[in-house]
Protein backbone atom coordinates (compact mmCIF):
# COMPACT_ATOMS: atom_id res chain seq x y z
CA UNK A 1 0.00 0.00 0.00
CA UNK A 2 1.21 3.49 -0.88
CA UNK A 3 0.92 6.20 1.75
CA UNK A 4 -0.48 9.60 0.85
CA UNK A 5 2.07 12.42 1.18
CA UNK A 6 2.20 14.39 4.42
CA UNK A 7 0.91 17.95 4.31
CA UNK A 8 3.42 20.78 4.54
CA UNK A 9 4.16 21.85 8.14
CA UNK A 10 1.92 24.55 9.59
CA UNK A 11 4.17 25.53 12.49
CA UNK A 12 7.88 26.06 12.95
CA UNK A 13 10.23 23.59 11.27
CA UNK A 14 13.63 22.39 12.44
CA UNK A 15 16.02 20.72 9.99
CA UNK A 16 18.54 18.22 11.36
CA UNK A 17 21.34 16.28 9.71
CA UNK A 18 23.42 14.88 12.62
CA UNK A 19 22.74 12.46 15.44
CA UNK A 20 23.39 15.18 18.01
CA UNK A 21 21.02 17.53 16.25
CA UNK A 22 18.33 14.88 16.00
CA UNK A 23 18.51 13.97 19.70
CA UNK A 24 18.39 17.63 20.71
CA UNK A 25 15.50 18.42 18.36
CA UNK A 26 13.41 15.53 19.68
CA UNK A 27 14.06 16.25 23.34
CA UNK A 28 13.61 20.01 23.01
CA UNK A 29 10.67 19.92 20.61
CA UNK A 30 8.03 22.59 21.13
CA UNK A 31 4.31 22.16 20.53
CA UNK A 32 3.39 22.26 16.85
CA UNK A 33 6.95 21.90 15.62
CA UNK A 34 8.05 19.77 12.66
CA UNK A 35 11.44 18.04 12.79
CA UNK A 36 12.72 17.27 9.28
CA UNK A 37 15.53 14.75 9.20
CA UNK A 38 18.00 14.77 6.31
CA UNK A 39 18.72 11.52 4.52
CA UNK A 40 21.25 9.44 6.42
CA UNK A 41 21.96 6.58 8.80
CA UNK A 42 21.68 7.76 12.41
CA UNK A 43 23.16 5.47 15.06
CA UNK A 44 21.19 6.57 18.10
CA UNK A 45 23.29 6.90 21.27
CA UNK A 46 20.33 6.29 23.60
CA UNK A 47 16.56 6.24 24.00
CA UNK A 48 14.79 9.56 23.26
CA UNK A 49 11.22 10.81 23.78
CA UNK A 50 8.80 13.27 22.22
CA UNK A 51 6.99 15.17 25.00
CA UNK A 52 5.12 18.03 23.28
CA UNK A 53 1.76 18.19 21.53
CA UNK A 54 1.36 18.16 17.75
CA UNK A 55 5.02 17.48 16.99
CA UNK A 56 5.85 15.88 13.64
CA UNK A 57 9.04 13.84 13.22
CA UNK A 58 9.66 12.94 9.60
CA UNK A 59 12.25 12.54 6.88
CA UNK A 60 12.83 15.67 4.84
CA UNK A 61 12.69 13.69 1.60
CA UNK A 62 9.52 11.78 2.39
CA UNK A 63 11.38 8.57 1.47
CA UNK A 64 11.21 6.23 4.44
CA UNK A 65 14.21 4.12 3.48
CA UNK A 66 16.53 7.14 3.30
CA UNK A 67 16.39 8.05 7.00
CA UNK A 68 17.40 5.21 9.32
CA UNK A 69 17.34 5.51 13.12
CA UNK A 70 19.47 2.60 14.27
CA UNK A 71 19.57 1.26 17.82
CA UNK A 72 22.51 -1.09 17.30
CA UNK A 73 24.90 1.09 19.35
CA UNK A 74 22.44 2.23 22.01
CA UNK A 75 22.77 0.86 25.56
CA UNK A 76 19.00 1.00 25.92
CA UNK A 77 16.42 -1.57 24.88
CA UNK A 78 14.01 1.03 23.50
CA UNK A 79 14.52 3.58 20.74
CA UNK A 80 11.88 6.30 20.38
CA UNK A 81 9.16 7.09 22.92
CA UNK A 82 6.10 9.31 23.15
CA UNK A 83 5.12 10.69 26.57
CA UNK A 84 2.28 12.85 27.94
CA UNK A 85 1.31 14.48 24.66
CA UNK A 86 -1.31 14.50 21.93
CA UNK A 87 -1.33 14.78 18.15
CA UNK A 88 2.21 13.55 17.48
CA UNK A 89 3.03 12.25 14.00
CA UNK A 90 6.02 10.05 13.16
CA UNK A 91 6.35 9.40 9.45
CA UNK A 92 8.51 8.54 6.46
CA UNK A 93 11.48 6.98 8.26
CA UNK A 94 13.02 3.67 9.34
CA UNK A 95 13.82 2.34 12.80
CA UNK A 96 15.89 -0.80 13.22
CA UNK A 97 18.00 -3.01 15.48
CA UNK A 98 16.27 -2.59 18.84
CA UNK A 99 16.33 -5.20 21.61
CA UNK A 100 12.91 -4.45 23.05
CA UNK A 101 10.51 -1.76 21.81
CA UNK A 102 10.98 0.31 18.69
CA UNK A 103 8.22 2.88 19.13
CA UNK A 104 7.29 3.05 22.83
CA UNK A 105 3.89 4.56 23.66
CA UNK A 106 4.00 5.50 27.34
CA UNK A 107 0.24 5.09 27.61
CA UNK A 108 0.19 5.58 31.37
CA UNK A 109 1.13 9.26 30.83
CA UNK A 110 -1.87 10.28 28.66
CA UNK A 111 -0.74 9.83 25.06
CA UNK A 112 -3.52 10.63 22.58
CA UNK A 113 -4.02 10.78 18.80
CA UNK A 114 -0.59 9.44 17.88
CA UNK A 115 -0.02 8.71 14.19
CA UNK A 116 2.74 6.41 12.94
CA UNK A 117 2.67 6.48 9.15
CA UNK A 118 4.81 5.14 6.31
CA UNK A 119 7.61 3.88 8.54
CA UNK A 120 9.80 0.80 8.27
CA UNK A 121 10.15 -1.16 11.51
CA UNK A 122 13.02 -3.60 11.05
CA UNK A 123 14.61 -6.17 13.36
CA UNK A 124 12.85 -5.15 16.57
CA UNK A 125 13.10 -8.08 18.94
CA UNK A 126 10.16 -7.56 21.29
CA UNK A 127 7.60 -5.10 19.88
CA UNK A 128 7.77 -2.82 16.88
CA UNK A 129 5.10 -0.65 18.50
CA UNK A 130 4.35 -1.09 22.21
CA UNK A 131 1.53 0.56 24.14
CA UNK A 132 1.86 -0.27 27.83
CA UNK A 133 -0.69 -0.83 30.59
CA UNK A 134 -2.72 2.08 31.91
CA UNK A 135 -3.18 2.27 35.71
CA UNK A 136 -6.72 2.15 37.15
CA UNK A 137 -6.55 5.72 38.45
CA UNK A 138 -7.92 7.93 35.69
CA UNK A 139 -7.82 5.11 33.15
CA UNK A 140 -10.83 6.24 31.15
CA UNK A 141 -9.35 9.70 30.71
CA UNK A 142 -5.77 8.75 29.89
CA UNK A 143 -6.12 5.48 27.95
CA UNK A 144 -4.69 6.03 24.40
CA UNK A 145 -7.48 7.13 22.06
CA UNK A 146 -7.69 7.95 18.38
CA UNK A 147 -4.26 6.64 17.37
CA UNK A 148 -3.39 5.46 13.86
CA UNK A 149 -0.73 3.06 12.58
CA UNK A 150 -0.87 3.05 8.80
CA UNK A 151 1.19 2.26 5.70
CA UNK A 152 4.10 0.83 7.69
CA UNK A 153 6.33 -2.14 6.88
CA UNK A 154 7.25 -4.38 9.81
CA UNK A 155 9.82 -7.04 8.99
CA UNK A 156 12.56 -9.10 10.57
CA UNK A 157 15.38 -10.73 8.67
CA UNK A 158 15.07 -14.00 10.61
CA UNK A 159 13.31 -15.58 13.60
CA UNK A 160 14.22 -14.21 17.01
CA UNK A 161 17.16 -15.79 18.84
CA UNK A 162 17.69 -15.96 22.57
CA UNK A 163 20.83 -13.87 22.12
CA UNK A 164 18.74 -11.00 20.70
CA UNK A 165 17.02 -10.31 24.01
CA UNK A 166 18.30 -11.40 27.40
CA UNK A 167 14.99 -10.27 28.95
CA UNK A 168 12.85 -12.64 26.87
CA UNK A 169 10.29 -14.43 29.06
CA UNK A 170 9.01 -16.97 26.53
CA UNK A 171 11.91 -19.09 25.30
CA UNK A 172 12.67 -16.66 22.51
CA UNK A 173 9.02 -16.19 21.52
CA UNK A 174 8.33 -12.86 23.24
CA UNK A 175 7.90 -10.96 20.01
CA UNK A 176 5.12 -9.17 18.13
CA UNK A 177 4.69 -6.41 15.59
CA UNK A 178 2.15 -4.15 17.33
CA UNK A 179 1.13 -4.79 20.97
CA UNK A 180 -1.21 -2.31 22.63
CA UNK A 181 -3.37 -2.32 25.76
CA UNK A 182 -6.40 -0.21 26.72
CA UNK A 183 -6.62 1.31 23.24
CA UNK A 184 -9.82 2.98 22.08
CA UNK A 185 -10.88 4.09 18.60
CA UNK A 186 -7.62 3.16 16.90
CA UNK A 187 -7.13 2.45 13.20
CA UNK A 188 -4.45 -0.06 12.20
CA UNK A 189 -4.57 -0.25 8.42
CA UNK A 190 -2.65 -0.71 5.19
CA UNK A 191 0.45 -2.14 6.87
CA UNK A 192 2.64 -5.06 5.80
CA UNK A 193 4.14 -7.53 8.30
CA UNK A 194 6.75 -10.09 7.24
CA UNK A 195 8.63 -12.64 9.33
CA UNK A 196 7.57 -11.69 12.86
CA UNK A 197 8.61 -15.04 14.33
CA UNK A 198 9.76 -16.42 17.65
CA UNK A 199 12.65 -18.82 18.07
CA UNK A 200 10.35 -21.87 18.06
CA UNK A 201 7.55 -20.42 15.95
CA UNK A 202 5.35 -19.48 18.91
CA UNK A 203 5.50 -15.70 18.87
CA UNK A 204 2.64 -13.29 19.55
CA UNK A 205 0.50 -11.67 16.89
CA UNK A 206 1.80 -9.44 14.16
CA UNK A 207 -1.05 -7.30 15.49
CA UNK A 208 -1.91 -7.93 19.16
CA UNK A 209 -4.70 -6.00 20.91
CA UNK A 210 -5.69 -6.73 24.50
CA UNK A 211 -6.54 -5.43 27.99
CA UNK A 212 -9.91 -3.76 27.40
CA UNK A 213 -9.16 -2.46 23.95
CA UNK A 214 -12.32 -0.90 22.52
CA UNK A 215 -13.74 0.02 19.11
CA UNK A 216 -10.56 -0.46 17.12
CA UNK A 217 -10.48 -1.17 13.38
CA UNK A 218 -7.86 -3.46 11.83
CA UNK A 219 -8.17 -3.47 8.06
CA UNK A 220 -6.35 -3.87 4.76
CA UNK A 221 -3.18 -5.26 6.33
CA UNK A 222 -0.98 -7.85 4.63
CA UNK A 223 0.64 -10.39 6.97
CA UNK A 224 3.14 -12.96 5.65
CA UNK A 225 5.11 -15.64 7.51
CA UNK A 226 4.30 -14.45 11.03
CA UNK A 227 3.64 -16.94 13.83
CA UNK A 228 0.23 -15.40 14.54
CA UNK A 229 -1.51 -13.00 12.20
CA UNK A 230 -4.05 -11.01 14.17
CA UNK A 231 -4.58 -11.58 17.89
CA UNK A 232 -7.64 -10.08 19.57
CA UNK A 233 -7.12 -10.93 23.21
CA UNK A 234 -5.03 -13.37 25.21
CA UNK A 235 -5.70 -16.23 27.66
CA UNK A 236 -4.02 -14.21 30.41
CA UNK A 237 -6.25 -11.66 32.17
CA UNK A 238 -5.43 -9.31 35.04
CA UNK A 239 -6.37 -5.92 36.50
CA UNK A 240 -10.02 -6.96 36.71
CA UNK A 241 -10.34 -7.07 32.92
CA UNK A 242 -13.28 -9.20 31.78
CA UNK A 243 -12.86 -8.71 28.03
CA UNK A 244 -9.68 -7.99 26.13
CA UNK A 245 -11.38 -6.56 23.05
CA UNK A 246 -14.81 -4.92 22.85
CA UNK A 247 -16.46 -3.72 19.65
CA UNK A 248 -13.37 -4.24 17.48
CA UNK A 249 -13.49 -5.18 13.81
CA UNK A 250 -10.95 -7.06 11.67
CA UNK A 251 -11.79 -6.86 7.99
CA UNK A 252 -10.24 -7.10 4.54
CA UNK A 253 -6.86 -8.45 5.68
CA UNK A 254 -4.59 -10.86 3.76
CA UNK A 255 -2.79 -13.39 5.99
CA UNK A 256 -0.40 -15.98 4.53
CA UNK A 257 1.30 -18.77 6.51
CA UNK A 258 0.59 -18.03 10.17
CA UNK A 259 1.21 -21.44 11.74
CA UNK A 260 -0.07 -20.71 15.26
CA UNK A 261 -3.25 -19.01 14.04
CA UNK A 262 -4.30 -16.64 11.29
CA UNK A 263 -6.79 -14.78 13.47
CA UNK A 264 -7.42 -15.65 17.11
CA UNK A 265 -10.07 -14.18 19.43
CA UNK A 266 -9.84 -14.65 23.20
CA UNK A 267 -12.12 -12.98 25.76
CA UNK A 268 -13.86 -10.63 23.33
CA UNK A 269 -17.26 -8.94 23.23
CA UNK A 270 -19.20 -7.71 20.20
CA UNK A 271 -16.23 -8.05 17.85
CA UNK A 272 -16.44 -8.82 14.13
CA UNK A 273 -14.09 -10.80 11.91
CA UNK A 274 -15.25 -10.06 8.37
CA UNK A 275 -14.04 -10.66 4.80
CA UNK A 276 -10.48 -11.73 5.61
CA UNK A 277 -8.46 -14.05 3.38
CA UNK A 278 -6.18 -16.49 5.19
CA UNK A 279 -3.98 -18.85 3.19
CA UNK A 280 -2.10 -21.66 4.92
CA UNK A 281 -2.98 -25.05 3.41
CA UNK A 282 -0.14 -26.74 5.32
CA UNK A 283 -1.15 -25.23 8.67
CA UNK A 284 0.30 -27.39 11.41
CA UNK A 285 -2.35 -26.38 13.95
CA UNK A 286 -5.37 -26.38 11.60
CA UNK A 287 -6.68 -23.11 12.99
CA UNK A 288 -6.71 -20.40 10.36
CA UNK A 289 -9.30 -18.81 12.63
CA UNK A 290 -9.32 -19.77 16.29
CA UNK A 291 -11.89 -18.71 18.91
CA UNK A 292 -11.08 -19.40 22.57
CA UNK A 293 -12.91 -18.90 25.90
CA UNK A 294 -15.55 -16.15 25.95
CA UNK A 295 -16.38 -14.39 22.69
CA UNK A 296 -19.79 -12.93 23.42
CA UNK A 297 -21.52 -11.48 20.38
CA UNK A 298 -18.69 -12.42 18.00
CA UNK A 299 -19.51 -12.48 14.27
CA UNK A 300 -17.21 -14.39 11.90
CA UNK A 301 -18.48 -13.82 8.37
CA UNK A 302 -17.42 -14.06 4.72
CA UNK A 303 -13.86 -15.14 5.47
CA UNK A 304 -11.97 -17.15 2.86
CA UNK A 305 -9.92 -19.80 4.64
CA UNK A 306 -7.58 -21.51 2.22
CA UNK A 307 -6.54 -24.45 4.33
CA UNK A 308 -7.75 -26.68 7.16
CA UNK A 309 -10.24 -24.16 8.50
CA UNK A 310 -11.34 -22.99 11.93
CA UNK A 311 -11.11 -24.23 15.48
CA UNK A 312 -13.86 -23.09 17.82
CA UNK A 313 -12.87 -23.56 21.47
CA UNK A 314 -15.17 -20.83 22.75
CA UNK A 315 -17.84 -21.07 25.42
CA UNK A 316 -19.94 -18.43 23.65
CA UNK A 317 -22.53 -18.52 20.92
CA UNK A 318 -20.76 -17.22 17.83
CA UNK A 319 -22.31 -16.32 14.48
CA UNK A 320 -20.43 -18.09 11.70
CA UNK A 321 -21.84 -16.82 8.40
CA UNK A 322 -20.79 -17.42 4.81
CA UNK A 323 -17.20 -18.55 5.41
CA UNK A 324 -15.50 -20.60 2.70
CA UNK A 325 -13.06 -23.30 3.81
CA UNK A 326 -11.10 -24.83 0.95
CA UNK A 327 -7.55 -24.93 -0.39
CA UNK A 328 -7.70 -22.10 -2.94
CA UNK A 329 -4.02 -22.06 -3.92
CA UNK A 330 -4.79 -22.25 -7.62
CA UNK A 331 -7.33 -19.41 -7.40
CA UNK A 332 -5.00 -16.70 -6.02
CA UNK A 333 -2.76 -14.37 -8.02
CA UNK A 334 0.51 -15.34 -6.27
CA UNK A 335 -0.09 -17.05 -2.92
CA UNK A 336 3.56 -17.95 -2.34
CA UNK A 337 4.41 -14.25 -2.05
CA UNK A 338 1.26 -13.36 -0.10
CA UNK A 339 -0.71 -11.92 -3.03
CA UNK A 340 -4.15 -13.35 -2.30
CA UNK A 341 -6.09 -11.39 -4.90
CA UNK A 342 -8.67 -13.57 -6.58
CA UNK A 343 -8.48 -14.82 -10.15
CA UNK A 344 -11.30 -16.01 -12.34
CA UNK A 345 -10.65 -19.52 -10.99
CA UNK A 346 -12.11 -18.56 -7.60
CA UNK A 347 -15.62 -19.49 -8.64
CA UNK A 348 -16.62 -20.68 -5.18
CA UNK A 349 -15.83 -17.25 -3.71
CA UNK A 350 -16.96 -14.90 -6.46
CA UNK A 351 -20.37 -13.32 -5.77
CA UNK A 352 -20.96 -15.79 -2.94
CA UNK A 353 -20.65 -13.54 0.13
CA UNK A 354 -23.51 -12.40 2.32
CA UNK A 355 -23.83 -8.60 1.88
CA UNK A 356 -22.65 -6.80 5.01
CA UNK A 357 -23.13 -3.07 5.63
CA UNK A 358 -19.84 -3.00 7.58
CA UNK A 359 -17.79 -4.00 4.52
CA UNK A 360 -18.69 -1.95 1.46
CA UNK A 361 -15.13 -1.96 0.06
CA UNK A 362 -12.38 -4.56 -0.35
CA UNK A 363 -8.68 -4.57 0.52
CA UNK A 364 -7.97 -2.28 -2.45
CA UNK A 365 -10.84 0.05 -1.48
CA UNK A 366 -12.81 -1.12 -4.49
CA UNK A 367 -16.56 -1.07 -4.06
CA UNK A 368 -18.32 -4.35 -3.40
CA UNK A 369 -21.43 -4.56 -5.57
CA UNK A 370 -22.13 -8.29 -5.53
CA UNK A 371 -19.64 -9.25 -2.84
CA UNK A 372 -17.04 -11.99 -3.04
CA UNK A 373 -15.94 -14.05 -0.05
CA UNK A 374 -12.64 -12.92 1.43
CA UNK A 375 -10.72 -9.66 1.40
CA UNK A 376 -10.54 -9.14 -2.36
CA UNK A 377 -13.37 -8.21 -4.70
CA UNK A 378 -12.68 -9.40 -8.23
CA UNK A 379 -13.62 -6.38 -10.33
CA UNK A 380 -13.41 -7.88 -13.81
CA UNK A 381 -15.91 -10.71 -13.52
Q: For the regions a protein language model found, what residue spans apply to each?
A:
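Predominantly extracellular beta-rich ligand-binding scaffolds that present long acidic/polar faces
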Residues: 220-224, 236-237, 242-341
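Acidic Gly/Asp/Thr-rich repetitive segments characteristic of extracellular carbohydrate-active
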Residues: 3-43, 47, 347, 361-364, ...
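Parallel beta-helix/beta-solenoid
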Residues: 30, 52-61, 64, 79-124, 148-155, 189-192, ...
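C-terminal accessory segments
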Residues: 325-380
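Right-handed parallel beta-helix/beta-spiral solenoid domain characteristic of secreted/periplasmic
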Residues: 10-23, 36, 51-100, 326-330
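Extracellular beta-strand/beta-solenoid scaffold signature
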Residues: 70-81, 97-108, 123-141, 162-180, ...
